[in-house]
């Protein structure tokens, strides 16, 4: 599994600017994610699909905020850093900035 650990990054859009953390873990052979954004109630998230390709992970998910729309996340992990984006309905691709391992 790629990207196991706790990571932080920044996101800047016209609706939200800030930092968050995501814990990526092995949930009995499938990917598990816990997302924390200080000061924000994180909506319910359902992971529909995860594809691993080398050091990249691509995930498709849905959220209670837009229940009939797919979100996509792609991240490429190095030892202690990552780059990537989240594709949000209506907004398009939003870059994940300053991705780094914190635990």
Task: Please state what every model-predicted region is.
Residues 1-77, 85-103:
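Central antiparallel beta-sheet cores of small beta-barrel/beta-sandwich binding domains
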């Amino acid at each position: 599994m790629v990207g196991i650990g706790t990571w932080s990054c920044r996101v800047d859009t016209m609706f939200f600017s800030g930092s968050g953390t995501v814990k990526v873990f092995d949930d009995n052979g499938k990917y598990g994610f816990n997302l924390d954004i200080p000061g924000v109630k994180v909506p319910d998230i359902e992971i529909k699909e995860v594809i691993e390709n080398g050091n990249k992970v691509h995930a498709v998910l849905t959220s209670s905020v837009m229940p009939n729309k797919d979100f996509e996340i792609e991240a490429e992990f190095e030892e202690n850093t990552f780059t990537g984006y989240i594709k949000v309905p209506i907004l398009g691709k939003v870059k994940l900035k300053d991705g780094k391992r914190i635990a």
